[in-house]
Amino acid sequence: MAEGNVGKLVQIIGPVIDIRFSRENLPNLLNAIEIEGPDGKIVVEVSQHIGDDTVRCVAMKSTDGLVRGMEAKDTGGPITVPVGRATLGRIFNVIGEPVDEKGAVAAEAKAPIHRPAPSFEDQATSTEILETGIKVVDLIAPYLKGGKIGLFGGAGVGKTVLIMELINNIAKEHGGLSVFSGVGERTREGNDLYNEMIESGVIDKTALVYGQMNEPPGARMRVGLTGLTMAEHFRDEEGQDVLLFIDNIFRFTQAGSEVSALLGRMPSAVGYQPTLATEMGALQERITSTRKGSITSVQAVYVPADDLTDPAPATTFAHLDATTVLSRQIVELGIYPAVDPLDSNSRVLDPAIVGDEHYSVARGVQEVLQRYKELQDIIAILGMDELSDEDKLTVSRARKIQRFLSQPFSVAEQFTGMAGKYVPLKETIRGFKEILEGKHDDIPESAFLFVGSIDEAVEKAKGK
């Protein structure tokens, strides 16, 4: 099929466009087609072949101003985006155009956003932990280098703040390259993140790709792939260990559902697209470690109506190595990050990988918190006085642990007025071990709230 192949628009229904080509020059599926609109170039992607000479396409930009009869030019291949060092410090849209008003990008190479996942022989696995400096994460559900991590939570429980803190900590402590894909989230948050990165000096090691809430569904469905393509280049061509942040993977599913309905497909469970698992698999299987380098991905997962059994979060679960679940009950206690230590888990929390001390402290913490959870009904009905001395001690330690799992974040400094803390894993394990052993039974529980290491809690108690 020759490049420079021109067709004509025959139907426009919102973001879905039908274009007629000659029979012998019908563009392939997933090809990018360019249309010169009144406000510049509009890129659409082929989704279906209808009859012998018409393709149905999904637009990556608003189709305002397009009319039937306009010319459309087939590019002869998928959407291609700039890759390489030139992308660092810049903001792109889904089709790889810079949107930060800093001029053109002098990228040496471009790569298509659709490509197969690495073959079985090319993949490599490691069992190294990625230290985040966030106590609750490092202790209870540690992250695997080159693994996939999901941050699950309903609306307003702190997923984006946690992602911003991870970007900040990992860029400062590990100096790695990051790619951030903003998929269908708030433009204001994207702007805040960009300014935050400039202030903290990590912008030069990050490429940002945004397809926010106001974009058409085609853009929101493909922007995750655009960010992933940039990350793959750093992994495959430069042998880097890259971090890929996706906020929010649910919006990718949501956009897919919108596109599916617009293309006239029969909906599946809860109104989602019938191809939900396939689309999710095509994206997730490309996020992996190869012999050349690794991609560690952290994905925020919005949970509709706090229901973890909804098909969108449930499909995402299957692909993850670690899940960090944010809980509204913990938000109500005023403890941040609101990570649920009993619901969050990780494949890496295994004595063979993290060592016996880390494993036993983590399980000890969960045991105490679980016992406290069981005792809460008794406390609510009968009060603390009816508990045995042993249970009273358990409750006291559990409340200290609960508060010690909180931590001030660097990225939230302007809201809280508290300096952010990065806590090394050794310090985290030591702190919780001392609480479990009863070394700090005499310290009031308020001293453990929003501190870094255990020494700070002791100092805070002395200061009172």
UniProtKB/Swiss-Prot annotation:
> Its quaternary structure?
F-type ATPases have 2 components, CF(1) - the catalytic core - and CF(0) - the membrane proton channel. CF(1) has five subunits: alpha(3), beta(3), gamma(1), delta(1), epsilon(1). CF(0) has three main subunits: a(1), b(2) and c(9-12). The alpha and beta chains form an alternating ring which encloses part of the gamma chain. CF(1) is attached to CF(0) by a central stalk formed by the gamma and epsilon chains, while a peripheral stalk is formed by the delta and b chains.
**Where do transmembrane segments lie in this chain?**
none
Q: Say which species the protein is native to.
A: Alkaliphilus oremlandii (strain OhILAs)
Question: Where's it mainly located?
Answer: membrane
NCBIfam families documented for this protein: atpD
Q: State the UniProt keywords alphabetically.
A: ATP synthesis, ATP-binding, Cell membrane, CF(1), Hydrogen ion transport, Ion transport, Membrane, Nucleotide-binding, Translocase, Transport
Give EC number(s), comma-separated.
7.1.2.2
**What reaction does this catalyse?**
ATP + H2O + 4 H(+)(in) = ADP + phosphate + 5 H(+)(out)
Q: Where in the cell is it found?
A: Cell membrane
**Membrane topology per record:** Peripheral membrane protein
Q: Name one GO molecular function term.
A: ATP hydrolysis activity
Q: What is this protein called?
A: ATP synthase subunit beta
Q: Belongs to which family? A: Belongs to the ATPase alpha/beta chains family.
The yes or no answer to whether the keyword Membrane is present is yes
Top-rank taxon:
Bacteria
How is this protein annotated for GO cellular component?
plasma membrane; proton-transporting ATP synthase complex
What the protein does comes down to: Produces ATP from ADP in the presence of a proton gradient across the membrane. The catalytic sites are hosted primarily by the beta subunits.
Q: Which Gene3D superfamilies match?
A: 2.40.10.170, Bovine Mitochondrial F1-atpase, Atp Synthase Beta Chain, Chain D, domain 3 (1.10.1140.10), P-loop containing nucleotide triphosphate hydrolases (3.40.50.300)
Give me the residues that bind ATP, please: G153, G154, A155, G156, V157, G158, K159, T160
